[in-house]
């Protein structure tokens, strides 16, 4: 089994090494791995829809493991506004900076949790002034996350909030869609998606040894991404490596 998987990994690497893998190509690769290559949909064990769902699951899992897509957004704070919606593609806030109106230097704002703010000052919600911290909360209708500033700015202390955040890529749907929002520098890591999905299918079919082999290949791909792509969260995908990282703290 190990020899077969190594040979297969090499073949797939050659096929992905020169160009981006589209959704259609990923599905074809997975069908080869799990021996579901009939050209007739009537004889395929897994529909294109099934494979697309698993590929999107893999994309989310890998992105949760390695925050490789990041961007920055900004907004101008208002004295009358306590919370501001965060982008819908936000995975996690990485850094927040504040440039007070009229100032020339941007200040980094440390994060505080809601419980940490309460422990620090039970009346924190009524405090106003120049922001020194930010906090994240879930919007009351559970559709988006929101950012708040502490203390809340007044007219004399408004400014521009700069948010660097990790992006959750769009799900793939069209056959020509490319993983990870089409980022060209992530092309070498597309193979991890087909390895992950092949492992999931082998697991579903009860082929534990083959599933483990594919998960090890996917895990190796994730580890390469971690080594090469910079800042990482304290998170380990249980499906690939068998453990989940945790972190804790007080008065954050």
Regions found by a protein language model. Name each.
Residues 10-13, 95:
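Exposed boundary/loop context
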Residues 20-252:
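Glycine-enriched, solvent-exposed interface loops adjoining structured elements
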Residues 2-10:
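Sec-dependent signal peptide recognition
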Residues 1-2, 22:
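N-terminal hydrophobic targeting signals that begin at the initiator methionine
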Residues 13-20:
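Sec/Tat signal peptide C-region and signal peptidase I cleavage site
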């Amino acid at each position: 089994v190990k020899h077969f998987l190594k040979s297969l990994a090499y073949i797939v690497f050659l096929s992905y090494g020169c160009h981006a893998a589209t959704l259609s190509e990923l599905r074809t690769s997975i069908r080869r791995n799990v021996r579901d290559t009939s050209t007739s949909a009537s004889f395929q064990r897994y529909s294109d829809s099934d494979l697309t769902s698993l590929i999107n699951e893999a994309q989310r899992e890998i992105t949760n493991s390695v925050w490789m897509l990041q961007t920055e957004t900004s907004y101008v704070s208002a004295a009358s506004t306590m919370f501001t919606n965060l982008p819908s593609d936000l995975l996690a806030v990485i850094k927040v900076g504040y440039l007070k109106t009229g100032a020339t230097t941007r200040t980094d704002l440390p994060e505080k949790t809601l419980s940490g703010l309460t422990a620090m000052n039970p009346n924190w919600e009524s405090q106003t002034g120049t922001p020194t911290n930010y906090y994240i909360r879930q919007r009351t209708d559970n559709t988006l996350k929101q950012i708040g500033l502490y203390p809340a700015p007044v007219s004399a202390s408004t400014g521009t909030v700069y948010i660097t955040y990790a992006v959750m890529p769009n799900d793939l749907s069209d056959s020509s869609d490319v993983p990870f929002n089409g980022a060209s520098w992530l092309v070498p890591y597309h193979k991890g998606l087909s390895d992950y999905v092949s492992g999931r299918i082998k697991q579903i079919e009860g082929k534990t040894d083959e599933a483990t082999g594919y998960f090890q290949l996917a895990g190796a791909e994730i580890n390469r991404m971690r080594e090469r792509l910079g800042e990482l969260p304290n998170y380990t995908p249980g499906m690939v490596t068998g453990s989940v990282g945790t972190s804790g703290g007080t008065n954050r």
